[in-house]
Curated annotation (Swiss-Prot):
GO cellular component, one term: plasma membrane-derived thylakoid membrane
Superkingdom of the source species: Bacteria
Modifications after synthesis and translation: Contains one covalently linked phycocyanobilin chromophore.
Membrane topology: Peripheral membrane protein
InterPro entries given in the database record: Allophycocyanin_b, Globin-like_sf, Phycobilisome_asu/bsu, Phycobilisome_asu/bsu_sf
Gene name, Swiss-Prot/TrEMBL: apcB
Function in brief: Light-harvesting photosynthetic bile pigment-protein from the phycobiliprotein complex. Allophycocyanin has a maximum absorption at approximately 650 nanometers.
Lineage of the organism: Bacteria, Bacillati, Cyanobacteriota, Cyanophyceae, Nostocales
A Pfam family annotated for this UniProt entry: Phycobilisome
Similarity annotation: Belongs to the phycobiliprotein family.
Binding, (2R,3E)-phycocyanobilin: 81
Protein name stated in the entry: Allophycocyanin beta chain
Keywords, ordered alphabetically: Antenna complex, Bile pigment, Chromophore, Electron transport, Membrane, Methylation, Photosynthesis, Phycobilisome, Thylakoid, Transport
Subunit structure: Heterodimer of an alpha and a beta chain.
Amino acid sequence: MQDAITSVINSSDVQGKYLDTAALEKLKGYFATGELRVRAATTISANAAAIVKEAVAKSLLYSDITRPGGNMYTTRRYAACIRDLDYYLRYSTYAMLAGDPSILDERVLNGLKETYNSLGVPVGATVQAIQAMKEVTASLVGPDAGKEMGVYFDYISSGLS
């Protein structure tokens, strides 16, 4: 896992040079949004279960996927879906705090699409639920933090699509 600081420093280090203006501006932007990120993470942490619950209600609960024969039918499959969505929310929050999506590749996306396909998990419905979670989260944390979190939800959605 990297953060925005490590990413900028490593890039300059590999090139054997001091931080240039563009690198310093990137760091300045990261630090300027630090308080916003921490407030958003605090709100998300305090409301994680409600965020997942509302996202499921908005995107999956009343669709064919939860009816007999659907991929979320049976309590075990439903619980696995909730667990996965909570996992995506948590790791998106980590990525938002770090200002870098690398943790999403390392801990979420590597091999996930293949695993879902082999288990018959509907990727489209998963992406729909992630997008619903993006909307619910933005409504709680406000437009600026919501936009920032949206980057990481979209990153996961794109990685699954």
